[in-house]
Design a protein with these regions (language model features):
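Gly/Ser/Thr-rich phosphate-binding loop
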Residues: 1, 12, 101
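Adenylate-forming
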Residues: 34-35, 49, 66-95, 124-145, ...
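Conserved ATP-binding/catalytic segment of the ANL
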Residues: 11-16, 21-79, 96, 107
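C-terminal boundary motif of the adenylate-forming
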Residues: 17, 59, 97-123
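Flexible loop/turn segments at secondary-structure boundaries
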Residues: 1, 22, 35-37, 63, ...
Length: 194
């Protein structure tokens, strides 16, 4: 579970270490199946293919002989203490909660992990209605103390599944839903990091 399988036979591959053995390294492949390069873009080709090795940009690690994709190399964050963190692992752990729809990690150059959290309005709304908690819209629901306590507990539960350095120590709940029209998410509803 959570792996992409084993490399195809006849393919040379390697995991290029980046300094943090727990995290893994960049998956690189070499062979006839590697494309010749980007059309009319020699600079991009030179960055992606070095000495015949295709640098995929995927950070992977071996798990029981299987390749597990950890994150994209460009998304890895380095804390002030020099620890490499994979945001997607932390974010997906938190989004396993039915009450958390989005979680965006903030850790680059910081002493600890912070997060922006967006509740799942439908699920949290039903939870609040069952407890007779009054609210009229997204923001009013987020701002109730009971919802803050609920999300505190969900973050604590998620943190228990993570290494100490990856645990969220501070978070802010968004008072509006992320919106494609505002440029906060892509057309496929993936959070824009920049």
């Amino acid at each position: 579970v959570g792996t992409v399988g084993v490399p195809t036979s006849g393919v040379e591959w390697r995991i290029a270490k980046g300094g943090d053995d727990d995290m893994g390294g960049e998956f690189q492949i070499k062979g006839e199946m590697v494309f010749a390069g980007y059309y009319k873009n020699p600079e991009a080709t030179a960055q992606s293919i070095v000495n015949g090795w295709l640098h995929t940009g995927d950070v992977v690690r071996l798990q029981d002989g299987q390749i597990k994709i950890v994150d994209r190399l460009k998304d890895i964050m380095i804390t002030a203490g020099g620890k490499n963190l994979t945001p997607s692992e932390i974010e997906n752990t938190m989004k396993a909660s039915p009450y958390i729809k989005e979680c965006v990690i903030v850790a680059e150059g910081r002493k600890f992990v912070g997060a922006l959290v967006m509740i799942d309005y439908e699920t949290v709304g039903k939870w609040a209605e069952a407890r007779r908690i009054a609210f009229t819209h997204f923001r009013s629901l987020v701002e109730t103390p009971e919802v803050r306590q609920l999300i505190d507990a969900e973050i604590a539960s998620g943190n228990a599944k993570l290494a100490q350095v990856a645990q969220i120590r501070n978070f802010h709940m968004l008072t509006k839903e992320l919106d494609h029209d505002d440029g906060e998410v892509t057309a496929t509803m993936k959070v824009r990091r920049s």
